[in-house]
């Protein structure tokens, strides 16, 4: 078995053993260990949350005093400790639902979303970046001053343009790829710290 396959299986097995819905939960855990995106008591919004691995990890990281909401267009099975909303992030009206639930601005916005992939790389990349722009429109209205955000990005033609756009909104931005990501995957994560609006 190749080392890569072994690693992939390791995270999948770990997720199964520890009750997480996807291996992606470990990406957030690793990112949080490096950058402390989510702390105890944080209010966290997970955009594009299906199947729920990041939402589950966010609950764990935010603890009992925290509050977590996940939003996705797809049906997501209920997650104890989180509010799940079936909604479209391309519809800015979801902001009202977010604010009604949290009753104040959130400390972190996390986005690990992917479009339904077509197999045409340039189309999928453009759509994924477009969804991230939609996330920033929501983020601008719900993220507290000095809050944090994470965006998964399919690396490609529009990645740097998106990075430059987001960079203006935060004190610091880091580009990283967690070990739990597949090595051959084009996904990167923009970790954005200290929201300045």
UniProtKB/Swiss-Prot annotation:
<feature type="binding site">
    <location>
        <position position="72"/>
    </location>
    <ligand>
        <name>S-adenosyl-L-methionine</name>
    </ligand>
</feature>
<dbReference type="GO" id="GO:0005737">
    <property type="term" value="C:cytoplasm"/>
</dbReference>
<keyword id="KW-0808">Transferase</keyword>
<keyword id="KW-0698">rRNA processing</keyword>
<keyword id="KW-0489">Methyltransferase</keyword>
<dbReference type="GO" id="GO:0001510">
    <property type="term" value="P:RNA methylation"/>
</dbReference>
<keyword id="KW-0949">S-adenosyl-L-methionine</keyword>
<comment type="function">
    <text>Specifically methylates the uridine in position 2552 of 23S rRNA at the 2'-O position of the ribose in the fully assembled 50S ribosomal subunit.</text>
</comment>
<dbReference type="GO" id="GO:0008173">
    <property type="term" value="F:RNA methyltransferase activity"/>
</dbReference>
<dbReference type="Pfam" id="PF01728">
    <property type="entry name" value="FtsJ"/>
</dbReference>
<keyword id="KW-0963">Cytoplasm</keyword>
<feature type="binding site">
    <location>
        <position position="88"/>
    </location>
    <ligand>
        <name>S-adenosyl-L-methionine</name>
    </ligand>
</feature>
<feature type="binding site">
    <location>
        <position position="112"/>
    </location>
    <ligand>
        <name>S-adenosyl-L-methionine</name>
    </ligand>
</feature>
<protein>
    <recommendedName>
        <fullName>Ribosomal RNA large subunit methyltransferase E</fullName>
        <ecNumber>2.1.1.166</ecNumber>
    </recommendedName>
</protein>
<dbReference type="GO" id="GO:0008650">
    <property type="term" value="F:rRNA (uridine-2'-O-)-methyltransferase activity"/>
</dbReference>
<dbReference type="InterPro" id="IPR050082">
    <property type="entry name" value="RNA_methyltr_RlmE"/>
</dbReference>
<feature type="active site" description="Proton acceptor">
    <location>
        <position position="152"/>
    </location>
</feature>
<dbReference type="InterPro" id="IPR015507">
    <property type="entry name" value="rRNA-MeTfrase_E"/>
</dbReference>
<comment type="similarity">
    <text>Belongs to the class I-like SAM-binding methyltransferase superfamily. RNA methyltransferase RlmE family.</text>
</comment>
<feature type="binding site">
    <location>
        <position position="52"/>
    </location>
    <ligand>
        <name>S-adenosyl-L-methionine</name>
    </ligand>
</feature>
<dbReference type="InterPro" id="IPR029063">
    <property type="entry name" value="SAM-dependent_MTases_sf"/>
</dbReference>
<feature type="binding site">
    <location>
        <position position="54"/>
    </location>
    <ligand>
        <name>S-adenosyl-L-methionine</name>
    </ligand>
</feature>
<dbReference type="InterPro" id="IPR002877">
    <property type="entry name" value="RNA_MeTrfase_FtsJ_dom"/>
</dbReference>
């Amino acid at each position: 078995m190749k080392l890569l396959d072994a690693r992939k299986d390791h995270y999948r097995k770990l997720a199964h053993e520890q009750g997480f819905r996807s291996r992606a939960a470990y990406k957030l855990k690793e990112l949080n260990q490096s950058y402390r995106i989510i702390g105890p008591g944080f209010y966290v919004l997970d955009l594009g949350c299906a199947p729920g691995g990041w939402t589950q990890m966010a609950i764990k990281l935010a603890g009992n005093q925290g509050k977590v909401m996940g939003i996705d267009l797809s049906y997501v099975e209920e997650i104890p400790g989180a509010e799940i909303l079936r909604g479209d992030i391309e519809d800015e009206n979801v902001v009202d639902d977010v604010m009604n639930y949290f009753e104040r601005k959130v400390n972190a916005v996390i986005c690990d979303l992917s479009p339904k992939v077509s197999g045409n790389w340039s189309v999928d990349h453009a759509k994924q970046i477009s969804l991230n722009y939609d996330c920033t429109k929501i983020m601008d209205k719900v993220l507290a001053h000095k809050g944090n955000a994470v965006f998964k990005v399919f690396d490609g033609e529009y990645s740097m343009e998106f990075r430059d756009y987001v960079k203006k909104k935060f004190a610091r931005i880091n580009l990283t790829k967690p070990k739990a990501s597949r090595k051959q995957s084009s996904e990167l994560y923009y970790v954005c710290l200290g929201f300045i609006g």
